[in-house]
Amino acid sequence: MAFKATREQQAAIDTAGNVLVSAAAGSGKTAVLTERVIKKLTDKVSPVSADRLLIVTFTNAAAAEMRSRIERRLDEECRKHPDDIGLMRQRRLLSNAKICTIDSFCIDLVRENFEKAGVSPDFKMSDGYSLLPVNESVLSDILNRYY
């Protein structure tokens, strides 16, 4: 079944520039973002190259679902327009698109810029629990300083 956007959803799809889509679960965010990406990739005047995409989600499942939907929609467009080499190129470049979680995006950013960030190149991510003593210490310092 084809996605039928509401007026508000269509506005998000058509908005120029970067966009943040925030809405309740099941409201169509993934469908809106998928259509927005397809519109950008298939623009006849100034298409965005698929390998330049950055799509950030909160969960691995959401990132995988987003990539899968974009692939399916781009495949549909390629079947509709089999002679469009631009579409074929976009489909090929899609594997290089950065569609990931906020965590993995930030980790990659720090890894690529560890010197500028002033961290060791072999830094490790915390599981959260190991930071509890640090959090308590920082909280204590803040409370002592300001209260």
Give the residues covered by each predicted segment.
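P-loop NTPase Walker
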Residues: 1-117
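ATP-hydrolysis module of ASCE/P-loop NTPase motor domains
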Residues: 91-98, 114-147
